[in-house]
Amino acid sequence: MRKMKKRYPDLHFDFHAHNDYDLAVSNVLAAVLSGVKGLHTTINGLGERAGNAPLASVQAILKDHFHAITRIDESRLNDVSRVVESYSGVTIPANKPIVGESVFTQVAGVHADGDNKNKLYFNDLLPERFGRVREYALGKKFRESQHPQKSGEYGTGTG
């Protein structure tokens, strides 16, 4: 793409990535770095064969790593993804970045404990940003001291 941009500097180039090798988002980012301005993305990565670059993932990376300003309302991405899931009949994998059911669930343990210690394991992917909430689940490393609210909720409390 960089050679094309250099050869035709006044042209507006778009980029359309397929996810056949699970690299659609990476390829979109490479296109951005080469100067492409138009990006083709889809909700939930739906598209031919293995799909296309998912809008939610591309948006998050553009904002967090490129400090790009877009007109995407991130707080609506989850709702839009659920509508598309419903109409398309294609289930969103639970671990799909940004919109998957379990991506903002911390299993009580080391990471959950870090949440209680001034966001020790902080990153920019806060669930509230995407219209979601952080959830906690009990795991084999659960300790009451980490999440006393869960102790009472699950009847494991000592009080």
Predicted regions: what they are:
Residues 21-34:
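Catalytic cores of alpha/beta
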Residues 36-51:
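Glycine-rich phosphate-binding active-site loops on the catalytic face of alpha/beta enzymes
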Residues 67-159:
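A mid-to-C-terminal "edge-of-domain" accessory segment
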Residues 16-22, 44:
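Active-site beta-loop-alpha junctions enriched in small/polar residues
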Residues 35, 58, 151:
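Conserved, mostly hydrophobic/aromatic
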Residues 1-15, 60-65:
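Alpha-helix-loop-beta-strand connector modules within alpha/beta enzyme cores
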Residues 47-77, 81:
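C-terminal helical cap(s) of enzyme catalytic domains, especially alpha/beta-barrels
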